[in-house]
């Protein structure tokens, strides 16, 4: 398990390798396609990326600088061409793909976005379903002993503590995963708030990055938030047991995240895959599971270096996944990844 200190080190500008990606420094590349790489994006990926950077450098002597600035920032920087690759838990929208027609999406990690809470006297594993979670973030449910929560937790001693919803104030793949899920289970959420890396939350308190959200959650009795799986694990947060479409209340782990990914029978041509709220036939699937995508230009002058790092990430780099609550990529996704990597520099 990684420490909170090591997680916090990946967020601020300049704290991963040189940090140029987080600061918007231009990446000019080299004609040979070798040399260092810069990337930026997903904070959910950051703990795994930190392991990749160290191991890849020791194996190859090449450095990878990564700015954990959020998926929205990663999309912006790869579109602007200021980094060699981006990383996002949200796939491109059609408009974003149109703005970056030469950038391909490669699902290179599999994890989850986890609803977590800090309520005095309430232990880990509180039951919640999607519509109730939506109503909390809509501001319709405001106390922890609300009948809707009590009904899902018979016999639990729920306090009248005020609920403080905490959300990401930056462009976030975790926000995308949450809102993608809520839009599938709550018609009111879909029509009034919608899906995106940045949405207008009707109520609550914002925090920048997974670390900012974690800080607000830790100091606020009655808070509910959503963070990447590695952050929930390393901080020891109490995690919701979310009801899936089969009616089972599950927490995220390698089995339940993997079960959600197993519902992917075929990979679309652009590799964009949503596995939130999987069908009831996936009885053990966690409903807020997600892929994280590498965003890579096929016409990069660093094609050789990019392909080397991507091959590492979906190959030897997978050895670090389990300890950080990242599940194994399904074989059909790995096959699509390899085919897409072969398009780079082609």
Specify the residue positions occupied by each region the protein language model found.
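Bacterial signal peptide processing site
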Residues: 24-26
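Bacterial N-terminal signal peptides that target proteins for export
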Residues: 1-11
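C-terminal motif of bacterial Sec signal peptides marking the signal peptidase cleavage site
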Residues: 18-22
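Short beta-strand->loop
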Residues: 38-42, 136, 144-145, 160-171, ...
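N-terminal segment of the mature folded domain
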Residues: 29-150, 158, 210, 214-218, ...
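C-terminal lobe and pocket-closing loops
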Residues: 245-305
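Ligand-binding pocket segment of bilobal, Venus flytrap-like solute-binding proteins
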Residues: 171-263
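Extracellular/periplasmic juxtamembrane helices and adjacent flexible linkers that interface
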Residues: 156-161, 279-346
């Amino acid at each position: 398990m990684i420490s909170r200190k090591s997680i916090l080190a990946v967020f601020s500008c300049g704290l991963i390798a040189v940090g140029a990606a987080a600061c918007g420094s231009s990446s000019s590349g080299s004609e040979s396609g070798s040399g260092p790489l810069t990337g930026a994006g997903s904070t959910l990926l950051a703990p795994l990326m930190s392991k990749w950077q160290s191991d890849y450098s020791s194996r190859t002597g090449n450095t990878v600088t990564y700015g954990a600035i959020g998926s929205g920032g990663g999309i912006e920087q790869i579109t602007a061409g200021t980094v060699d690759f981006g990383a996002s838990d949200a796939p491109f929208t059609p408009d974003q793909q149109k703005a970056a027609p030469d950038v391909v999406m490669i699902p290179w990690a599999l994890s989850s976005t986890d609803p977590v809470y800090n309520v005095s006297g309430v232990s880990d594993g509180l039951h919640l379903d999607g519509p109730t979670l939506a109503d909390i973030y809509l501001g319709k449910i405001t106390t922890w002993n609300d009948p809707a929560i009590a009904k899902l937790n018979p016999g639990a001693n729920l306090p009248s503590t005020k609920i403080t919803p905490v959300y990401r104030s930056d462009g976030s793949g975790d926000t995308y995963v949450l809102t993608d899920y809520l839009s599938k289970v709550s018609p009111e959420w879909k029509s009034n708030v919608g899906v995106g890396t940045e949405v207008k939350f009707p109520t609550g308190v914002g925090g920048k990055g997974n670390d900012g959200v974690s800080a607000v959650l830790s100091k606020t009795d009655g808070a509910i938030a959503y963070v990447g799986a590695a952050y929930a694990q390393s901080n020891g947060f109490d995690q919701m047991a979310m009801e899936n479409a089969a009616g089972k209340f599950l927490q995220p782990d390698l089995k339940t995240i993997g079960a959600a990914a197993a519902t992917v029978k075929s990979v679309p041509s652009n590799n964009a895959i949503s596995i939130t709220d999987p069908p009831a036939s996936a009885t053990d699937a966690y409903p807020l599971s997600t892929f994280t995508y590498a965003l890579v230009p096929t016409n990069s002058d660093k094609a050789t270096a990019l392909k080397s790092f991507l091959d590492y990430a979906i190959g030897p780099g997978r050895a670090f996944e389990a300890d950080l609550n990242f599940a194994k990529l399904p074989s059909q996704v790995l096959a699509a990844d390899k085919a897409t990597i072969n398009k780079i520099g082609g």
